[in-house]
């Protein structure tokens, strides 16, 4: 009787299993090797694999509007055809999205085909690399990227995004005319964390133009313009608040710590912390904070429309070259305040004789 009951139970369970759906809809897992098919079918897939894809010239690998909770995996080598255009080469948007790199993958943007020493200031029209726009509670991790034509990640209109273990290697551009190859440009976004990035480029490692609650931690930045707030001003959104940069090394770069606001503009920069920062072989400025910035070059005359308040520097140490300047602060009258610096030690370069309106709590 017991055996019969047990057999009946097992048969019933088997019938239930057989009758149940497989749990994986045919469209849940999608591997794409061409861009057109990926773009057409993306919205019906929960797990998207971009495998060994060559994206045609002038085409964005458009992964916007994905299913909530979708995962995108880059596998093998992803490449892009050559055309002069604005880009982007890749675009992703959605809620609870995960973008990851499979072991051994590479995303090769072939920037050398566009590099001409002019970046986005002229010459060839160069595509931006990756638009991370309109993302909510999402993550991008473990991507290996090389040779972006100009700026790499544009992060805009985002709420809650973690970028972890991103490698961008544009070092070939040091001698081949790469310019304006910012790694991470952030605007109008909140709750952003960039961690464990390894960046070799020719412009800002991180540039925060507007946004709040932004963390940059345990990153390696080499060859570029440092970790920057700004330039702030002259846009629709001109407020930066609540930024922490920590545990980061900036080497072989023009600048280390940089905060720059646009001459004559309005906005605000507040609650900024740089802590446990190591500088190595900085060519121009170890620490530079200026309220006179223009793309054509600083004016030397600070303006007060974008006050810089609550700047904490703690344990920022390292070296600049003999021709570089250790610290340079140029503030308008009364427009820099509430600064607190401790453990700041920059050596090897020149002392600036042009600092102006340095607030108490800081030194120049």
From Swiss-Prot:
It comes from Cochliobolus carbonum (Maize leaf spot fungus). Pfam families: Glyco_hydro_28 (PF00295). It comes from the Eukaryota. This is Polygalacturonase. PbH1 repeats lie at residues 158-188, 189-210, 211-231, 240-261, 269-291, 303-348. Belongs to the glycosyl hydrolase 28 family. The active site is at 203 (proton donor), 225. One of its GO terms (molecular function) is polygalacturonase activity. It catalyses: (1,4-alpha-D-galacturonosyl)n+m + H2O = (1,4-alpha-D-galacturonosyl)n + (1,4-alpha-D-galacturonosyl)m. Disulfide bonds join 30-45, 205-221, 331-336, 355-364.
